[in-house]
Each structure stands twice: as C-alpha cells, then as structure tokens.
Amino acid sequence: MMRFLPLSWVKRTGMLAAVAAGLLIAGTLGAAADPITLGSASTYGLLLGTNETLTANGFHVGGDLGLSASDKVNLSGYLTVSGNAYIDGTPSVSGGGSYSVSGSIVTQSMTAIDAAANSASINAGALTANLSVAGNAISVNSSTNSIVIKAITNASENVLTISSLSLTNGSITFDDNGYTNAKFIVNVTGAFSMTNAALIKGINGASGDDIIFNIEGTGTTVNLNGNSSTSLLGTILAPQRNVNLGGGGNLTGALIAGVKNAGTSYTVNQSGSGYNITSLGFTPRSSGGNVPEPSSIALFGAGVSALIAARRRRKR
C-alpha cells in the first residue's frame, strides 16, 4: 500500500538531500595524485647508471656526482665536482686529464638511487598531459623565434607530452602565470636536442628546480652541444639514452642518464670548450590536495546553512 508522507517530512528530506549533494560535490574534487619526485637522486648534478662511460674534457659539475657500478671515466681534460662524488665500486679511469672533488669521495651502492630516478621517469611519463603545442612537437630554430609554456595549475604538475624537441638559437620560456611554485613536466618520446645558442628561461617565479625534461624510451642520442651562449634550465632525465654535450654551454639543473640499464652500455660524452652544470635539481610540489573551487565552497556553505535552518525548525 502506498504511504503518503507528511509534507514537513518531505521538505526536510529534500533539504537533507540537497545538503548531501553539496557535501558530495565538495568532496569529489579529492586530492591530487602524488607529486613527481626524484627522491634520493635529487641532490645529483650528474648521475650515471650502471656500466656507463663518461668522457670529460673541461666538465664542471655543481652539486654531487654519482657513478654507478662498472662505470668508466675517460679524462680527456679536467673534471671538477663542487659537491661529493658517490661511487659504486671502483670505476675504471683512463686518459691524461685530471679531476678534483671539493667534497668527499664516498663509496656506496647506487642501486636504489638509480631506481628512484628511473621511477620518476616512469611516473612522469604516465601523467596525462594538460598542456599542448601545435603539431605535438617543439621546433625553434632561429634567434627570433620563441615559445612560452604557461602554467595552468600548482595543485598538480603542468604536463606537456611531445614527439620531439629541437631548440637551436631560439628560446623556450616557462611562465608560472600567477601560480606559486608551479611544476612543469615535458615528456619527449623521440629526438631531443638543445644546441648552439639555445636558451631556456623562467619568468614570474619559474626556475630550474621546477622543470623536468623526461626523455622517454630508447632512441637517438640527446644532443646538448651548444656554445658559450647556451643557457638551459631544468633536470634532463634520459634513462635510456646516450648524451652528447659541450661547446661551453651551461645547464642550471641536473643531468641524469642511463639509469634504466638493461644490458646496454650508455655514454655521456662531453667534448671540448667545457660544459657547466650548476646543480638545482627538481624539487617536488607540495603533496597537499586540490583546493576546492569557490563555487564548490559556496555550495558546501549553503548546504551547511540549510541543515542548520532545518534543525532549528524541527526544534520548534
């Protein structure tokens, strides 16, 4: 038999349903995914995976140097390290150059550190892109050309996934765009080169510790052969690539290469005229959840007010 409920009960039920809806909408925003982090690999200006060969010919590394098991060092010129050198085992050293380490030389396993860097690459590559560029690639090859990448959030990473990146004599600018401590992830699945007078800069708060260039998979050699005008920002993360660099360029960030080694011997080849890495490795964003949008907050407040009013009428 159908029951007819009192109108007062129906009104209260409807109001409580509206309140519940307000609570649900405010709650569906949820928390952002865990931030991308390099973990124990974050202090390294230069980190090489196992069985890798480093050729240095006027190479300065700011921060720490990490050499993994079975690595080889060919000193064609000098290699200087302003932090500590962490070495897994005894690397093979050849050539007539020299090296100096301002801090300590520490022997330790690098396995977990390499794994942390590789995990960062995998996690970054799994992010859904929320930025885009025409043609799904960046090609800036003239000093009169430039591209600006603007942040759209600081509650999660600003992610751009492209098929290739070629920067020659032009510039890429990262813009925090009014957000505080925005983070940028640029996933590159194909060729990657920043050569000649390539320039990467940050404005409105963006800096080298906010940017990762995540060069995914196996493929062509990462080309960082510049000149004295080359100035780059960010952590260059290339777990399965060879890297060439030189020509007097400067990277404010870090270079991490070969940390996903499945039997391949990768190389980092620094040619003449020097190269300088000033350590400012990637720092993760805050792990706090998303801030609800003002409309959601207003709806939540309205729901609470309605609930209070309903209870007062009920008491009467």
Predicted regions and their residues:
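A short, hydrophobic C-terminal helix/tail in secreted or cell-surface proteins
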Residues: P292-A310
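Bacterial N-terminal signal peptides
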Residues: G14-A26
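N-terminal leader/signal peptides at the extreme start of proteins
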Residues: M2-L7, R285-G288
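Primarily marks folded extracellular/lumenal domains of secretory and cell-surface proteins
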Residues: A32-G288
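Compositionally biased, intrinsically disordered low-complexity regions used as flexible
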Residues: M1-F4, G301-G303
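Bacterial N-terminal signal peptides that target proteins for export
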Residues: F4-A17
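Short, charged juxtamembrane terminal tails flanking transmembrane helices
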Residues: R313-R316
